[in-house]
Each structure stands twice: as C-alpha cells, then as structure tokens.
C-alpha cells in the first residue's frame, strides 16, 4: 500500500493538481460562481444548497460531482467529497487512495474581497492560500451587462420555473451564454443552469436551497489548520509526512 501511495503522491507533485485521475493532469471542472455567473442569481446574494455539477469535456467524457455550496455577498464556499464523484477519468482505486491520505474531502473558498482563495483539506488539517488572479472573479457587478429572453415555463425538482436565456457581456466584450431555470417559489433562485465553462458543457442543479445568510465563519480557513503558501508545498510536505513517518525526503 505504501508503494501505491508513493506512486500517487509522485503523480500529484508532477501534475501540480489534485485529485489524480487515470490521465494525469486532468481534474473536474468546478463551476465558478462569481463574475458573469453571479449575474444569473439576480439580487440573491446569500444562500446555501446542495449542488450537482454534470460536466462534459471536448472528448465527450462526463463527470458528475455532488457538493455543498454556501454564498454570502460574493464570497463562496464549496465542500466536495471526491469519493462521491462519478467519472470515467477516475481510476478504480484512486478514490480509496485519496481517502487513505486524507485527500478525498476538499473545501474551496473564494474571497474576491481579499483577492485570495483557499484550498482546504480537512483530512490533512491543512490548507493552501492562493491569490485570485482571474480578472472576472474580482470584477464588480457593474462590469457586466445582461440580456434575457424568456423561453417558457417548466418544472425542476417540483419547483415551478421560468426558463430564460441569459447573455452576459463583460467589460472586455466577451459574451457568456446560459440557459437558466428560475424557481418562482424560491424568489427566482436559479435551480438549474446550463452553461459552458473552461471549455466544458455544464449542467448545474441546486437542491435543498436555503436563502438565509450563511455564517460568516464558513468563509475563513480553520485557525488550527496548517497554512501553506502553495498547493505544491502543501502536497509535498503532507505526502512526506504520511508516507515517511520520519523517513524524510527520498534520496535524489
């Protein structure tokens, strides 16, 4: 088992990405809920929900990722258990290996107000802090213009909805097109979104929607966790701890 962990850790460090799949360097696209996506929520700035993201890449491979999401005034928190992900790109034993190393549970926090993000691994009691470099993520609401076209009425998960085509244009002239199902019994919350992000076609479904404000503490990393200045540093040190138990770095 220790050899398997070493192989997986090496792949992580070489790719610089987590999690690891049968094709190294590929990771599921997680939706960005800021920038043009935030315009799809209208005036709703605080909510929590369970979320299922279905993404299809250019080769036709489909990934389904369940998660929990919390949003408050532009801040976003996503909690994901990789063991629950369904994907043809995930090797059969990768999920179990990630769980054994404390890597299966991930929390991603985006703080546009601070221009930073956190990647947190509760199983490791560690997190990496990274600068938010995506211009769209830190753009203001005034940087986007919205055009809408109503497409009809529909029902999603028991909620009566208005189906609407959104075209959001940013201040650089780039257009982002989405189809949105706004639930009329949830203050027009978008319980279903179809869009394209990072070159992948996405369908995002929201359930158990709660429009109460989440606790502000959810958008901070735990003070007791070890902080790292990059994902690579965190992965390297955590893998050495879990594999070595005092072995130290492998010889060059």
Named regions from a protein language model:
Residues 17-22:
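Sec/Tat signal peptide C-region and signal peptidase I cleavage site
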Residues 1-8:
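Bacterial N-terminal signal peptides that target proteins for export
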Residues 9-16:
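Bacterial N-terminal signal peptides
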Residues 24-252:
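Extended soluble regions of mature proteins
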């Amino acid at each position: 088992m220790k050899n398997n962990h070493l192989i997986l850790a090496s792949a992580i460090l070489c790719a610089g990405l987590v999690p690891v799949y049968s094709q190294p360097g590929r990771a599921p696209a997680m939706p960005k809920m800021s920038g043009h996506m935030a315009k799809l929520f209208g005036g709703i700035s605080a909510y929590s929900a369970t979320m299922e993201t279905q993404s299809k890449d250019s080769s036709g491979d489909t990934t389904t990722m369940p998660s929990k999401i919390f949003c408050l005034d532009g801040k976003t928190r996503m909690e994901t258990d990789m063991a629950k992900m369904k994907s043809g790109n995930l090797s059969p034993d990768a999920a179990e290996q990630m769980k054994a190393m404390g890597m299966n549970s991930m929390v991603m926090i985006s703080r546009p107000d601070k221009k930073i993000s956190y990647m947190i691994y509760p199983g490791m009691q560690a997190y990496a802090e990274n600068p938010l470099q995506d211009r769209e993520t830190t753009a203001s609401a005034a940087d986007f213009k919205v055009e809408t076209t109503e497409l009809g009425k529909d029902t999603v998960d028991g909620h009566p909805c208005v189906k609407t085509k959104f075209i959001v244009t940013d201040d650089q002239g780039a257009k982002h097109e989405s189809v949105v199902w706004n639930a009329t019994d949830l203050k027009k919350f978008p319980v279903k979104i179809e869009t394209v992000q990072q070159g992948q076609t996405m369908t995002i479904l929201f359930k158990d929607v709660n429009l109460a404000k989440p606790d502000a503490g959810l958008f901070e990393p735990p003070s007791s966790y070890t902080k790292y200045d990059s994902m690579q540093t965190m992965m390297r040190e955590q893998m050495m701890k879990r594999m070595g138990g005092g072995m130290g770095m492998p010889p060059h």
